[in-house]
């Protein structure tokens, strides 16, 4: 419980910061499809296609592959993530490198390199904490920029009769090189819904507070991601 007491105040502070008064408000719907293929106990590849407004970006479409590298699974993590189809949740550390091609209406295309490290921690009472540190390296019109983002997620599996679903909350601040400050805070609340052995839906609400440009902008979005999971490993 000590870890939980340390985590919840942080989420509360980030929520208060994100809800400060702003002048402009928008709402969006963000569809996404991710297809994962586990190659062996160490490597997994996936292809992502999504609409997003991450870090205060305009509405845009991103597509591209990633490679993930796992460390060995932990028994405690496997217990709390038993009903989650994402096998990376059972690993203490997951490293990722990826590429995204990004397009937006009336804007030049953009390329992005992604480097990320995610640590997963089992908590008491069946809770699960995930800490993702990610760097985006962007090139647009031959101009380079970068941003750092740190996403903390807290989830727990619940059961209704024989069906298991996984509600979660998350917070992610962004540091943008073009503004030289922490310019965006994103808050998430949603749930994972496993369907069979290969499909898992992620339905969520996202609230963004963007302070990089003037006036500040507040964006609320509803998102729905379909995650597909396949494996070459024999179980």
Question: What do these predicted regions represent?
Answer:
Residues 25-90:
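Start-of-domain marker
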Residues 41, 49-55, 99-105, 121, ...:
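Transmembrane beta-strands of outer-membrane beta-barrel pores
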Residues 69-70, 74, 117, 218-235:
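Outer-membrane beta-barrel "beta-signal"
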Residues 120, 128-173:
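Detector for outer-membrane/organellar transmembrane beta-barrel domains
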